[in-house]
Amino acid sequence: MTSVRDFPKIKAIRSFIIGGVGSGGDYHNVKGGHWLIDSDISTPASKWDQYKKSRTSWGINVLGSFLVEIEATDGTVGFATGFGGPPACWLVHEHFERFLIGADPRNTNLLFEQMYRASMFYGRKGLPIAIISVIDLALWDLLGKVRNEPVYRLIGGATKERLDFYCTGPEPTAAKSMGFWGAKVPLPFCPDDGHEGLRKNVEFLRKHRESVGPDFPIMVDCYMSLNVTYTIELVKACLDLNINWWEECLSPDDTDGFALIKRAHPTVKFTTGEHEYSRYGFRKLVEGRNLDIIQPDVMWLGGLTELLKVAALAAAYDIPVVPHASGPYSYHFQISQPNTPFQEYLANSPDGRSVLPVFGDLFTDEPIPTNGFLTTADLDKPGFGLTINPAARHKLIPSDYLFKMPQVGSLPPPNPSEESEETSKPNGTLDSLAAKVESLTTSTTS
């Protein structure tokens, strides 16, 4: 009889930069003209005129996508995608790989803690923990495949048979016609646009309310671009529009500000969390009781392992969790939890008026909502149920082709006479790397 301790160990870690546009975990790595980057959308950079027209002008898509593969000793491979591009791949191998090789992939809590604590001196939030998130998701995908179970069955099983979606996009009428539960629209103007901008925001939302009728849920995404005074005034001006919730009105770090806007409008729903990280960050949001919903992104906050802790914390305060985007990675979480009433679908078509896979053409079998919902049967495949599209394989640039650098600890003492012509030039190594990425990326889009 096989011992319960006989379980495949982690044998190898591989990472890939995803070349081109329109594939992988960076939602904003799309072609020009896409509503998500080139619509009128208020952002933290909208206060400067040169950064208003397109979100790419201030670099929202600068990192790009990457993919991590984790291979077990029995040959099983789990994988996941996220945002981070070349810097993410570098950290996967130069820092985080040491905690993974030879480890038991079932020890997701231990592996998260080791990676999180070891990167605390430069991480905790942002890109480092987003990289940990993708590694964690690849571990869960591996576990599901080894056990021949969908991930949601590994984390408690189904609490519902159907996942209802709302759609984030430019046209609520399109979301309604496609069968979605509700629609979320990005706010077009910021406080620096003055009273005229505020008036235009109200007119914009009134137009959409009239287009879908009085009862179809409309949510507003403010994308961290407002301040307390402006938010209070805008919400007051829109009280008759029956806005379901106001999302990310303030900087993620302005927890006191959320208390002030909730005090000003106690019966209005406010949400945030898309740009928060780890259970420690969400503890502040939950314990303040100034938010009606939290919206973690499983590809950013620390992965599924950390999201489960955040969900338990929120449940103790009776606060619903509505995950931000993340495609199937969120779907398995959402269907397993009792305090997750619905899920976001981020419209991935250029005009936002049709339903396409969240991760573009990277996978052949990504489940997408039909008539605004999915069922548990749509998720009943091992792991996260995804298969890398053979036609997209050429976009996966192995990171070991780009990063052939010795470990820092093994570098010999400097010897100027042995420096190559390339590396002795200013930024020679970085320039060479950039040229390789550019040439490979260009070749995938031609």
Predicted regions, residues:
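Conserved, mostly hydrophobic/aromatic
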Residues: 10, 75, 96, 135, ...
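Metal- or metallocofactor-binding catalytic centers and their adjacent structured scaffolds
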Residues: 38, 54-56, 71-146, 414-418
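Metal-dependent enolase-superfamily TIM-barrel catalytic cores that perform enediolate-based chemistry
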Residues: 156-261, 265
